[in-house]
Amino acid sequence: MALKLNSADLYTTLSTRDLDASTTRAAYNALDSAITLRVFDSLSEVVRQQNTPHAAISYRFVRAMQGPAMSMVRRGIAVNTKVRQDETERFLAIRAKAQALLDTLANAVWGPEHYTVVTKTVEWFTPIGKRSQPLTPQTRTVRVESDAQRPRGLNPNSDKQVLAFFNIALHFPVEYEIRKTPQGSVRTPSANGKALRKWGQARTKGPGVDARDRTIPAVRLAAPFVSLILTIRDADKMLSVLRTPLDPDGRMRCSYNVVGTENGRWSSSKSAFGRGTNLQNITPSMRRMFCADDGQWLISPDLEQAESRLVAGLVWQTTGDDTYWAACASGDLHTTVARMTWPELGWTDDQAANRKIANTPSRELPKFTYRDISKRLGHGSNYRGTPFGIAQAVGVPPNIVEDFQVRYFKAFPALPQWHAWCKRQLLDHQYLDTPLGRRRWFFGRPNEDATLREAIAFGPQSTVGELLNLIMYKVWSRSLLPQSDPAFLPLQLLLQNHDAFAFQVPLTTHLPTIINAVNGEFNSTPITFVRGGERRDLIIPGEFVTGFNWAYADTNPDPGKWTFSDGNKDGLIKWGGSDERIRTSPAVARSADFLGRPSAPSWR
């Protein structure tokens, strides 16, 4: 049967004809396909008429990304059910311990909860008539109210309780956040992580104490409560991932949206069947249950110091200053930055000695080394972060960030010049182009700091994501070649994690050969920067880790600082030319693994 349908009278035509369900669905599917083709033809003409190639480049690139994305969606990743159960028990124990301690401390602050207990009893009685004669016995309900009290505790997931505890019981000032509602943006009291951390850092003498009394020191009164609440909330997030439904074959799958963000990075969500979760948002400590299939190695490459190198390229392209480029090319960017930021520390010409100096604790902030400060604060300063904002994100006093930025921008004066160039570009054109040809229009107010910081971060972050996806695409394409082809790679893509991807190869594969071949794709994919008549190619080397599960193995000599009690011997380690380990925990758990499993680990 052939039907000629117009979209305007589709419903009337299909509802008045005597069509079976299969034919009706076929008609709808055909119309959807026809409309999609018409939209494609129209958009293709719009793209063709553009004066710049940016739209066409981006469109072709994201269409190509559907291949590796669908490959990973269909394959999924194996889940070690034994590790999954062990981790569930571990986080349940952590949560129970933290909740018990939080309830005890909260009860000491705001005391027990007073409530009314209502007791109802049914009793028989004999009513008396008008002439004092007994009538037929009847029943009645006697209601007795009595006052009682019980431990109040504190529910960390109840904003109402948390706000009452901090703002009323502890007398901390109310923190607000802007929430979007159908009626518009509304300023409401907040008990989110940012508000909790602010309360935790505040020093006070406590409720009922005269603030002018110098005999009582101010302390961080809320710190224990904040720590416990955040611990419980983190445990709840971990448990939600651990309890995520698996597919019938025991694997976890997600769906990837290759055009899910404004800067070209992918986004991830549940699979098309409602199972799985966002696999791009799994914390490092949660990754252990995700593993390679039995008989396979798990390999994960990423771009080494990619964002810093791209900032260096953009700074040179816009200002002509290559000081930061030279620092990135030195081999140890953060030590070089520390040396240029604190020249008074007695540096030498020996790279190993300088690394040792950079790893000494800072005088102003002993819990961080000079190298740590250079890494953490330098990253935020590259994107024009304010001292207050960086201090809040890193957890250091704002004056430390202010002092660092004075030194940092003195060592690299071209960075503020690049920020100024981005501001002019934003004000004049309201768009920016990346070195890979993606153009983004910014619809926020071009004179606002938030829009400017977003524009500054766009270039490096978008380029890192698309460069890694391009390399992943080239690697995936080689896995589709015939095995007789010299360029064939015997690998299977498993995951894409914004700035890294993961694949598996058989244990029989010669690891150095595979890693050298993949690294060759990194080295053959340069990013070109042009300034006037000069061109510079930036090659960002790949950094590889190998193992059997997705979490990192604990390498700290002190077992007390391990993430996992057993050190996660099957975890990822940095590739150093060889990996002779033998797998200890299979992907498909044996029955003996469950029968001999120890009891739930205690909270620590």
Show where each model-derived region lies.
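Extended, non-catalytic structural segments that build the interaction scaffolds
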Residues: 50-55, 151, 315, 319-327, ...
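Conserved "right-hand" nucleotidyltransferase catalytic core of DNA-directed polymerases
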Residues: 2-282, 291, 295-297, 304-307, ...
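C-terminal polymerase-core module
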Residues: 93, 112-217, 410-461, 508-604
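Hydrophobic (often cysteine-bearing) scaffold residues that line and stabilize catalytic clefts
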Residues: 32, 307, 330, 334, ...
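Function-dense linear segments that define catalytic or interfacial modules
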Residues: 255-361
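Secondary-structure transition/capping motifs at alpha-helix termini
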Residues: 46-49, 75-78, 93, 109-112, ...
